[in-house]
């Protein structure tokens, strides 16, 4: 793998540095929305923690000078009274103790509020990510670049907003301290401030450059990171572990996992060694400048220009000032890095969303049913000229009370047609009508209420049995009567009632006391889920009985025909025993409808359908 692209050599390390801070304001706004009182508390504690160190240094000077004066007074007094001599100094010591206590209280307040905000903000950002996911189209989810964006956002962005805010308040605290220290240092010499800045600036420039390098590396290798996560899932999930063990894949996948880690670790190690080496070398400059100033203050004190207390104060102020400035510049560099990572979050949140402009709840021609008019579909991306459509020039009409069966090889476009019907995809060309109105003009909610679908790759929710049914109609999610009714239609009620907790039984192995079902039982659960929508007049079954035995399959379709008598029924199946009773059969090959008609008519035509039917029938002889 080639190294990540670097910035142009002509650009400076700080090129575009401050431009990236556009996300700081949004992060602060996010924290304000999460808890304005905690943010105000952070501001107050920051102010206290920023001002009081300089006050403590000034009081420290007064204590040292007070001790020197008390010693001289006590030594020169004719009738020395120790209590009288030390009382003013002890008051100053008590005052400094109070200041230190307030600083400790402010620091504890900062720590407590940051800890609480971390939990609140992490939850808020994760909810934002998941809410955004709910607005994205299926086509966007099938885009690997969006998955990379989502992976980057979820890995870092939930912690970065608070980190950015903490650094912002830390910067404010250090800036206040620096201002306070600056007032004291200027009394010594304005050059002292210049020395302070000059000592910390090289480290800041270095950190800014390496923060940008780390971020570019992070973005560039998202696919490798996603592969690591995928391999972890495959090796540790019950739905994949059977094949992993049977095929002996542990060693193969673990080695691939290790290889990816080794590659990523080597990149991290190179960057870390360069970053820390330069940080050490440039940090030595700061140390040298500090001790140069240290010597300067000592010389001035020996020369009599400064008192012992002033020397103590200036040394303390210079040391704390250097630490505060270094922390400030490091915070700015860290804020830069946090802003870079937050760009992942906002790039994801700003993904364009297909406008839901449809408002219709009733079509222009009620009862007309479904119409596909010259519908073609190509997946987005790639060369639109060279890319073959997945579906090409599909036209059909299905009236209420009619059934349609789709027949064809795997990958012929059958399931894609269903995704177009349910508006998971939009046609590239042509249009789909429901009751005489374009599908895009319908309200999404109204369309969902009219459609009951079971896909071949249905979801096996690690929830209770009843909840697995309830997801079919969220308005009746907790309605036990509706669960039972749907389960009877889907032939799941028999085995559900035999379970220990009935409809309250936990399914799957992810949670305690969960029960796993057979493939056929899961299909009955999914079928029952499709029947949850009482008002659905479009029923779609995509290979609904692939894991069922012949007797169960026959009963399922007998009930399906009864249930869908006055509805529009669409069935995808490779079993001709189930499709032969459909009012209309479409044979699809490579996205084209090559044959259409009833079972008898297609047999008379003696085309592809007849050939496939005879092949399957031969297997039963």
Regions found by a protein language model. Give the residues of each.
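Cytoplasmic coupling helices
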Residues: 112-134, 138, 196-236, 255, ...
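Membrane-integrated ABC transporters
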Residues: 1-53, 70-92, 106, 110-114, ...
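ABC-type nucleotide-binding domain
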Residues: 358, 363-621
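Hydrophobic patch in the ABC ATPase nucleotide-binding domain
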Residues: 138, 351-354, 492-496
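Transmembrane helix-loop-helix hairpins at lipid-water interfaces of multipass membrane proteins
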Residues: 39-109, 181-214, 288-295, 299-308, ...
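Conserved catalytic Walker-motif region of ABC-type ATPase nucleotide-binding domains
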Residues: 133, 257, 372-374
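An intracellular "coupling" helix at the cytosolic face of ABC transporter transmembrane type-1 domains
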Residues: 33, 154-164, 217, 223, ...
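Cytosolic ends of transmembrane helices, especially the final helix of ABC transmembrane type-1 domains
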Residues: 220, 249, 273, 293, ...
